[in-house]
């Protein structure tokens, strides 16, 4: 389930570090978090959709790798991001 352009623009404007920022770890993690929450809601209704469940696990793994990278490079940005997104670590 791809995100609509409006949702992407809102996430980018909220989490961007500079203008027109699409590739910073904060923006990427925020987008992945939104997709993960959408897929989680989908799987609550469609419990036997195993293809989407695998996609969810891949997204969670990608987000975990990005968060690990951010924690290694700048721990303060990492802590601010997980606090802002409400993630637990």
Swiss-Prot record:
It comes from the Bacteria. GO terms for cellular component: cytosolic small ribosomal subunit. Keywords: Ribonucleoprotein, Ribosomal protein, RNA-binding, rRNA-binding. One of its GO terms (biological process) is translation. GO terms for molecular function: rRNA binding; structural constituent of ribosome. The keyword Protein biosynthesis does not apply. The keyword RNA-binding applies. SUPFAM superfamilies: S15/NS1 RNA-binding domain. CDD domains: Ribosomal_S15p_S13e. One of the primary rRNA binding proteins, it binds directly to 16S rRNA where it helps nucleate assembly of the platform of the 30S subunit by binding and bridging several RNA helices of the 16S rRNA. Belongs to the universal ribosomal protein uS15 family. PANTHER family: RIBOSOMAL PROTEIN S15, BACTERIAL AND ORGANELLAR, SMALL RIBOSOMAL SUBUNIT PROTEIN US15M. HAMAP family: Ribosomal_uS15_B. Part of the 30S ribosomal subunit. Forms a bridge to the 50S subunit in the 70S ribosome, contacting the 23S rRNA. This is Small ribosomal subunit protein uS15. It comes from Parafrankia sp. (strain EAN1pec).
């Amino acid at each position: 389930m791809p995100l609509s352009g409006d949702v992407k623009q809102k996430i980018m404007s909220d989490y961007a570090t500079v203008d027109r920022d699409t590739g910073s770890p904060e923006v990427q993690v925020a987008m992945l978090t939104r997709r993960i929450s959408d897929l989680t809601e989908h799987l609550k209704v469609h419990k036997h959709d195993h293809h989407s469940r695998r996609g969810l696990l891949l997204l969670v793994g990608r987000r975990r790798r990005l968060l690990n990278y951010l924690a290694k490079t700048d721990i303060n940005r990492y802590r601010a991001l997980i606090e802002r997104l409400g993630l637990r670590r």
